Amino acid sequence: MTNSIALQYSWLAKFFHWFTLLLLIAQIPMGFILVRLDFSDLRITIENVHVIVGISIFYITLFRLIYKFFSKSPKLMPEAFFGQNLIAKLNHFALYVALLTITTSGILKKLFNGEKLNFFIFKLRIEDNFDLADQFYNVHVLSLIHI
């Protein structure tokens, strides 16, 4: 880019955006299906996919934030009134918070239930705490409302 003002989002920013959306479109119905299934091989398979997709969304969101920090975003519409630009910035911030909250709470719910999680580059297991697991499950479900 020859100037310091971006006229549109880069192809990588667009990729992060649309890939995250596609993962969420797959992820949310899987979560609703999981709560209706009894324990079975099908439930384990769907839950494993749900966890892998969730951890992927977590990493993609972190990459998006790092990329956003080091790259230029297009300027907001100068003709828009101040409140509209402020709302746009707050909306982006809230979506990042919601994405990180829903993924982090899902991860912590699994870990406090005594399960070991594979984070692609390392495995993690912590001491069981079922009360905390229930609290993180509630946060996980409630944060879905804000996506």
Predicted features, each with a name:
Residues 1-145:
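Membrane-embedded alpha-helical bundles that constitute the cytochrome b-like, heme-associated redox core
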